[in-house]
Amino acid sequence: MRRFCRLLFLNSLLSISICKAQNPAHLVADEFKEHFNVEEKQLETVEELLLKMKKLAHSRSFAGREFGHDAVEDSKKEVAISTQQGTIDKKVSPFLFEGDIFLSRRQAVDILKALSKDKTKRLRRSFVSDKTATWKSLPIKYRFHESIDFYTISQIIAAIRFWEDSTCITFENVSDAPVGDYIEFFSGQGCYSMIGRNGGRQGISIGESCVKMGVIEHEIGHALGLWHEQSRPDALGYVSIERDFILPSYISDFLQRDDEIDTLGIPYDLGSVMHYGSTAFSVDQKSKTVVTRDSLYQQTIGQREKLSFYDVATINTAYCKEECKSEKTECEYGGYMRPSKCSECLCPDGLGGEKCEKNEDAKNAECGGILELSDEWKTIESPNYPDPGYEADQKCSWLLKAPKGKRVEIEFIEDFSFLCTSTCVDFVELKISDDLRNTGFRFCCYDKPEISFVSQIDTAIVIFRSQLSADIGFKIQVRSTESEPRTTIAPTIITTTMAPITVDTPNVWADWGEWSMCSRTCGGCGIRSRVRSCRSKKCEGRRQEFGTCNLKACPVDKHCAKLLSNNRLCNGKVCTKNDIAISSCDAPQCCPPFVNVDGMCQSDQENHHDELWLSI
């Protein structure tokens, strides 16, 4: 069997090494059977149920049209649920619901039954309502399949760390397949996962186009029990579905459901990492299929940077009610005690400090702050506005406070320019509703917002974020006002409060256990882990740590080839250039960022061997 290695250089900064076995005869069904606790017959049943679902939804929406013809035509086109997430692989598409969900047989049957009925009553029921689908014991065990490369592993661990830091959910990496329930990360044909715990081996596919923290957090969110945000029964109060622009055979992927989904009292969040993008399943990948009721939210939906505050709150409400019970909640602006560390507040985006009382600390820039407003205008601008402008990977936030009884007025002035994408990646965000926990309006591209914004309460938050590019940025002026607020959709207030945990004894950790076996035999991209147990009721710190291992360079493989790809943005605009070169693997190989030095894999980054995994 021939092998190939792929080495990608992204934005001249990140390198990814991918080695796989090529086998043209490989059946897509084998991917599901290998990584999920499913047999051939079950897989066929799920495929049949999904097809019935598609046909039924198609007949109701497009009476008189032939489903078979539409399905054939649609299969020729690329589809995705968000421009920030990879396209859906056509080979796995027949087995997936809503683009990236592999349903259990029971879930598929329940959804088809609900679709077959004429339901007129909608219950306020984004979380799986089946209580058996929650993970009963922690930590959740997981392992990496050999198809996962070194860089992807690091991104998966970073995503897991984000979940662990923000919730009471804990994970444990294991080298071999354990007995019982566990997650197996593998490099499959696209990005997909199951909803909730399904028993035994449960895969999460992180394909080549999925190696982004927000996408990985999204797929882990499915495994914990999160459905897509726009599937909630209350979704049509916030978005409308434009059927004329949806690929007809995919209309079943736009259902709002009540029986399978429980909102847990969490407000609808247009900035959820679980939300479809505006061109999901679009006929031409440009026409909008999901349109926000408030047009100012249009470029907010579909983000895949990270979990939103309410994404995390949903899981904390479902799993962590017993945490932090004895702690007095002193967090401001809707923050609450962090379940993973009850002495800290978990703050809404844009806020920070011990009690969420101040703006969030800046990232890679000197900016942000707290502004006490008066009737006089004050100005705020992005870093280095307007020239040379902001740089990639910066963040700033400003907490704006008007006198009691007044509101905050915001106007954009002078030049305005950001990287232009259908879902804003670089943006300025205004949080001006009476719920500062929810995501606000995000603005990008080149057209300066011309209207004057007025907050609903005496406080507002402005957030600047750049992920990919450099550009001019924004400048605004702010002041206090007695004007009426700009009308917008009022988010529902959370009805389920976080139950604040008793820590009766100080941290008492046991000694670290033995290191696990290395996941690779050579090349420096292997990892090993070890765990320790908490001997007191509550411990702070990591219960598992990771290290690199087997740093000897891999032997020469004459059948191996490298694909070098260089992708970069130019001048901060939408401009991408791809350069490809082929070369043979004629020397012992190391996984990036390691290089072969006298037969050993060493990093060109100082202390990289020792610190990479321990710092994740």
Swiss-Prot record:
Any one Gene Ontology molecular-function term assigned to this protein's record: metalloendopeptidase activity
Domain TSP type-1 positions: 506-555
Species assigned in the record: Caenorhabditis briggsae
Domain called EGF-like: residue spans: 316-357
Main location: secreted
Active site, renumbered: 219
InterPro entries in UniProt: Astacin-like_dom (IPR034035), CUB_dom (IPR000859), MetalloPept_cat_dom_sf (IPR024079), Metallopeptidase_nem (IPR017050), Peptidase_M12A (IPR001506), Peptidase_Metallo (IPR006026), Sperma_CUB_dom_sf (IPR035914), TSP1_rpt (IPR000884)
Protein name listed in UniProt: Zinc metalloproteinase nas-36
Proregion span(s): 22-125
Classification of source organism: Eukaryota, Metazoa, Ecdysozoa, Nematoda, Chromadorea
N-terminal signal peptide: 1-21
Residue positions binding Zn(2+): 218, 222, 228
One Pfam family here: TSP_1
Glycosylation-annotated residues: 173
SMART domains referenced in this protein's UniProt entry, alphabetically: CUB, TSP1, ZnMc
Name of the gene: nas-36
Disulfide bonding pattern of the chain: 168-320, 191-210, 324-345, 347-356, 367-396, 424-444, 518-549, 522-554, 534-539
